């Protein structure tokens, strides 16, 4: 009933600097549900084990969903009676599991002299253990009776709806608040999760990705169109998956040159029913993309003319 894929590629900037990949991703498909997860370790100076942190976030989320779904019928009944409450419980469970994994790793792997050498003694004392492993997390679950997702920090979740339209039920800006570290390592992490659920429709697919993918596009429209193109190829996912990875690698070499992860799960039956709608949506998107390109070109030409006019005016005044 369900299928999916996941890919993680290292960014060019990390290859150049000799930094390990900070991203992690996974997908799982079961009889009654499927899961797609990505995480992006922060990678900055004080988050020097965030590559491990992202791996732990993926594991914590996967284990949480599997535990809640241990009795699928009972879980579905509970979820439908209180979606917000169940998602909040799952978020708390993920945080708790992640913190336990962090402490477990830390106690068995004390900080090395090499890890400490970048800090003064005073600076190092101020760093909390959880912060060392800081990471974002995006989780999507597609089941028999509903689809839901939750995330903390930047990254994106794209839903391919029943009508073949692509949308982001959780806005990108919502998960990247200014001046706030929306992270698994935040002491108030539970307050920075954002979620969505859909119980009245049967989505075709759901994608989750780290911010390396989103920032490689010029606009939200282009970003969503990309997912429509991918959705249109999901029926041949085994053959198409290598091309997806190749494209992600190409994107990770340009733009922000960041690590990039993309994971997806989809309903095979709904996909088969809606494949013609997806093809039509891709063609409509192409028309809109051409219009956007023409409008962008016109704006650039207008700005170019305006700049030339201003320069001519300055030269005249100087004379």
Annotate each predicted stretch with a short phrase:
Residues 1-22, 100-128, 170, 278, ...:
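Short glycine- and acidic-rich boundary segments immediately preceding or forming the N-terminal edge
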Residues 179-319:
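C-terminal catalytic subdomain
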Residues 29-32, 142-145, 153, 160-164, ...:
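Short acidic-glycine loop/turn motifs at beta-strand connectors
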Residues 59-101, 227-249:
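Helix-loop-helix
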Residues 19-29, 125-144, 148, 172-218:
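Acidic loop->beta-strand submotif enriched in PP2C/PPM serine/threonine phosphatases
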Residues 1-67, 155, 186-190, 196, ...:
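N-terminal entry segment of metal-dependent catalytic domains or homologous docking segments
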Residues 36-40, 150-152, 207-209:
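Short hydrophobic beta-strand that contains or immediately precedes a catalytic carboxylate
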């Amino acid at each position: 009933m369900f299928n999916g894929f996941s890919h993680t590629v290292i960014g060019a900037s990390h290859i150049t600097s000799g930094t390990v990949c900070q991203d992690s991703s996974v997908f799982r498909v079961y009889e009654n549900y499927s899961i797609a997860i990505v995480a992006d370790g922060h990678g900055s100076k004080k988050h020097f084990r965030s590559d491990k942190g992202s791996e732990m976030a993926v594991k914590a989320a996967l284990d949480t969903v599997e535990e809640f779904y241990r009795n699928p019928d009972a879980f579905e009944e509970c979820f439908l009676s209180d979606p917000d409450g169940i998602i909040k419980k799952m978020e708390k469970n993920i945080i708790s599991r992640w913190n336990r994994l962090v402490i477990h790793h830390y106690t068995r792997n004390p900080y090395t002299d090499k890890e400490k050498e970048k800090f003064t003694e005073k600076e190092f004392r101020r760093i909390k253990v959880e912060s060392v492993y800081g990471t974002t997390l995006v989780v999507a679950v597609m089941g028999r009776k509903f689809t839901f997702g939750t995330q903390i920090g930047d990254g994106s979740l794209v839903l391919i709806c029943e009508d073949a339209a692509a949308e982001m039920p959780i806005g990108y800006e919502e998960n990247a608040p200014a001046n706030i570290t929306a992270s698994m390592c935040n002491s108030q992490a539970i307050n920075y999760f954002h979620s969505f659920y859909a119980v009245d429709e049967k989505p075709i697919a759901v994608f989750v990705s780290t911010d390396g993918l989103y920032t490689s596009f010029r606009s939200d429209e282009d970003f969503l169109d990309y997912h429509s193109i991918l959705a249109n190829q999901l029926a041949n996912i085994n053959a198409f998956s290598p091309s997806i990875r190749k494209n992600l690698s190409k994107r990770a070499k340009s733009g922000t040159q960041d690590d990039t992860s993309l994971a997806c799960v989809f309903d095979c039956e709904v996909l088969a029913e809606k494949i013609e709608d997806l093809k039509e949506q891709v063609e409509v998107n192409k028309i809109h993309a051409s219009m956007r390109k023409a409008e962008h070109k016109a704006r650039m030409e207008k700005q170019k003319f305006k700049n030339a006019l201003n320069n001519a005016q300055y030269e005249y005044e100087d004379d």
